[in-house]
Amino acid sequence: MPALYSVDDCESLTTKQVHGLYKDHVNKSQVSLMTSFGFGQELVESAEGVWITQRDGRRVLDFTGGVGVLNHGHNHPRILAARQRFQERKSMEVHKTYFSPYVAALGHNLAELLPGDLNMSFFPNSGAEAVEGAVKLAYKYHGGRRSRVLRADISFHGKLLGSGSLTGQNQSGFQFPGIPGVGIFRYGDLESVRTLVAELRTDKGESDVYAILIEPLSASTMNECSEEFLRGLRELCTAENIVLLFDEIYTGWGKTGTLFHFMRYEGLVPDILTTSKSFGGGKSSISAFVAREPVFRKAYDNLTDALLQSTSTTYYGFGEEAVTAIEAVNVAVEDDYPARARDIERILAPGLARIAKEYPDVVAEVRGHGALHGVFLHKGPKVLELVTKLVPGAMTKDPRFRTKLITSSVVNALYRDHGIYTYYTLNGDNPLMVAPSLVAEPHEVEFFLDCLDKTLAQGLPRLLTRFVKEKVSSLW
């Protein structure tokens, strides 16, 4: 008999054993990287709300928001109950040729909540799949007669071959092949888009662009499109019959203070919206692309395409995933998650502004909305010179390595000294992200601000030196 681990066995594995299994069967380098941080040397016993309890009994305040997944916090009781009810009823998961009441209801709920005629939904499993499904829909809408798709230079739409080629930030430094016909415009620059659209014409003088993708707020860089840009983009796409896609995979379900970020601008409606992450309530791997009815019906409302075979996945619309999303959406609406995000912002924004003013040599800028903010740290000559001295030259081949190291030193200190779990983005200027779940209480936000203040008071040189000496030098 092969020596297989059971679920019970997993729950009794030590940190050392888990590291060993990762080295043998997952990725040895991942162990080297993650053990640079304190949380890479611990295992989690449980998680609830915004708190993580480790095996050693230490409680950690989670201010990552699950990188967009945990608007509802860890293990929301209503979501757990919905999943348990589905399981106890022994409901059917796979609805391929049976109709699913859950898919039907979920599609209805999205249509009720979204503006205009965003009425038609499809439910893949990940954000990247939703983006690719949306792009396919746009291409099919034009019958394959147009060949160009446009994305911004600042963009993150996924890591599959298709969605990866529509992403402006290359996190690995290795270039994979992608879909043909991708054009690039400057984020937030309407004239850049207009110029590109004007250049991309067929021999008949018609537009050759089938879709334009944009993130109204880029959660990976904390850049934001202006209302003027988004409305101008909508006007241009309408005039040229180009399908306009808004990617709100991270920023949806109340995170920035409105149900979706674009909804702060009355009357603004994309042709297709993508969503995922907190759409699954922190327990379900589900996404959606939601299309305006005329766009969807022209592409797929016929017997040949009725099952969307060109874009469907094995697990699309899976029973328990759809049930979880239904409950997640209802919780977000009934508990008014946009208002919760605004309440968090009323504490967080002035608190971060005060810290930035108090430590001008440490904090360069703070940007954000609702419960999603980026703290950009100074990377002046003195700090970069210190990084160069502390770190072996071979490790600086990554052009962003120095900035990552600076932010990592703050992430590590917050965890080590105060039991606060944070992260930094791998794109742009690698800001420290402050992105609590929307169930965070005011006193928890205040506690975070107090701990960030105490951490930054030490100064970047001290934080950097400590981080490198404690963790990095032992590995390199």
Please give the residue ranges for each predicted region.
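Conserved N-terminal phosphate-binding loop of PLP-dependent enzymes in the Aspartate aminotransferase
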Residues: 2-476
